[in-house]
């Protein structure tokens, strides 16, 4: 088993090493945009990328809610900037559509269901997968990267630390090993891959900025979007799963670095204050149910 896992990792590394594109302007020292001078993205759409039922809420709220089930949303976001489009995460695999058994990253803990496909939602506003310039990944858990392979012509943006993590040898935690193996399978070998080292100004004008928020995974990131009428919006990724995490500084047990997670939450708090930004939390179903859904949009 260990030999097979090592062989799979080496094959993944060999394939990816041939495919990495040149970098965006992206380093740990890149400054976040000036709130008064940042450009604007035209539109921000929320896409329904699945929903899930977990059997123990305490995994996400340590010390509380033992054995209580909880439902999560899975959200993707689509951003228009001029003639270009950026897709933030790709959600649960389309193969899970209407499957009564669902799909899972960790079958003993959580099951995901899908009611509509990503491609159908794009088609509803006249887009094809080939119209998407960038696919930016908050991190590599399967419910966020399930459809990356539908976008072979898009440039995939992810943190170098995240790529290194899923490429690393297995450790003692079986859940983590399982998540990393699934990530390698779902990511495959993108034709265009850019590995980032920290924050990145995607379009060069401060309208859309990838923000390094490690902790949940080593290369987790969030997204800062600037819109003319809606102002600044932060798309959380999994820096938090629930508003309660943010309010209480609670870090889910399924996490790679608790201290880094708390530091990342603090960073998001500072950004909210600096930009007077709204925070949209990916998995918080109560919040997601109140947000606009494609074809409606934020501008």
Feature map (PLM): residue ranges:
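Bacterial N-terminal signal peptides
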Residues: 10-21
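Core dinuclear metal-dependent hydrolase active-site scaffold
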Residues: 46, 69, 76-80, 86, ...
């Amino acid at each position: 088993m260990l030999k097979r896992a090592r062989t799979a990792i080496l094959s993944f590394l060999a394939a990816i090493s041939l495919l990495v594109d040149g970098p965006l302007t992206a380093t740990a020292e890149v400054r976040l945009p000036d709130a008064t001078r940042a450009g604007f993205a035209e539109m921000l759409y929320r896409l329904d990328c699945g929903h899930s039922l977990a059997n123990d809420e305490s995994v996400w709220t340590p010390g509380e809610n033992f054995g209580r089930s909880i439902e999560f949303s899975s959200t993707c976001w689509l951003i228009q900037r001029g003639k270009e489009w950026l897709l933030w995460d790709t959600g649960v695999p389309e193969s899970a559509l209407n499957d009564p058994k669902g799909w899972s990253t960790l079958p003993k803990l959580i099951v995901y269901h899908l009611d509509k496909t990503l491609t159908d939602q794009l088609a509803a506003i006249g887009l094809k997968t080939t119209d998407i310039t960038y696919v930016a990944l908050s991190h590599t858990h399967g419910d966020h990267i399930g459809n990356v392979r539908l976008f072979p012509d898009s440039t995939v943006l992810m943190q170098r630390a995240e790529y290194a993590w899923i490429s690393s040898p297995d450790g003692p935690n079986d859940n983590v090993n399982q998540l990393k193996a699934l990530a390698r399978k779902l990511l495959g070998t993108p034709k265009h891959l850019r590995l980032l080292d920290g924050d990145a100004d995607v379009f060069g004008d401060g309208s859309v900025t990838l923000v390094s928020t490690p902790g949940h995974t080593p290369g987790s990131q969030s997204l800062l979007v600037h819109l003319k009428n809606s102002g600044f919006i932060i798309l959380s990724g999994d820096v938090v799963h629930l508003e309660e995490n943010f309010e209480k500084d609670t870090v889910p047990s399924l996490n790679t670095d608790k201290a880094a997670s708390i530091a990342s939450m603090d960073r998001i708090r500072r950004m909210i204050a600096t930009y007077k930004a709204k925070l949209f939390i990916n998995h918080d179903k109560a919040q997601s149910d109140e947000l606009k859904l494609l074809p409606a949009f934020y501008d």
